[in-house]
Amino acid sequence: GKPCPPITSVDKFGSYEVVGGSSDSYLVPGMTYSGGKIYPVGYFTKDNPVKGSPGAPSFAAGPPISEGKYFSSNPIIPSHSSSSSNIYQSGASSAIVFQPVGSGGVQPCGVGSSGSKGPCSLSGSGVHSSSSISSSSGSSFHPCGTVSQGPCSPPGTGSFSGSSSSKSGGKIILQPCGSKSSSSGHPCISVSSSTLSGGPDGSPQPDPSAGAKPCGSGSSGKIPC
């Protein structure tokens, strides 16, 4: 479909605030637009509740589906491994939230991908977050060196944006490795927040296979790793 407008912030309810454009021009399948924000279809605001029999409200891009089914059929992060040993848990508080693709300064990783600022993402070293990450201002972000400058994203898989360490449904949170991690210095992913696979009823369920690999010679070359 068409590209989404820039995502400027993520609120505590998990919606994406956008600037410019119209809902008709920027909606992609599976997303809905309301009050200047984009939501997965089936996620409705307090101001726009679902009324009467199940169906598509006037502002929806399609029929309602569960958030779990939406994210399991539209994976945000590629699954590189089915082994839970490749998922590193961390007790660190700061986090980078992996969000659906937007065009707000996020570029594909690789040669020539430079210019944008954000959580540092260096070639071969994964993602390094900073305690000064801000979700609303670029002044706290620092650019990366070498080939890729963050935030960056493999084409079609998503984008990185600074946010809080909220574990609400649909978000994949990469945390810096800490004392509890088995691979200090590499991106970590909280197993409890790996909710990409829909359960029998479509509700999000932990999916250890949607984890991050340690960076190095065995890495697939994609970020996150």
UniProtKB/Swiss-Prot annotation:
GO BP term, pick one: cell-cell adhesion
Keywords: Secreted
Polar residues bias: start-end ranges: 178-196
Segments for region (Disordered): 140-225
InterPro entries the UniProt entry points to: Corneodesmosin (IPR026087)
Highest taxon of the lineage: Eukaryota
One Gene Ontology term of the molecular function aspect: protein homodimerization activity
GO cellular component terms attached to this protein's record: extracellular region
Biased composition (Low complexity): 155-170, 202-211
Cellular location(s): Secreted
Role played: Important for the epidermal barrier integrity.
Protein name: Corneodesmosin
The species this protein was found in: Sus scrofa
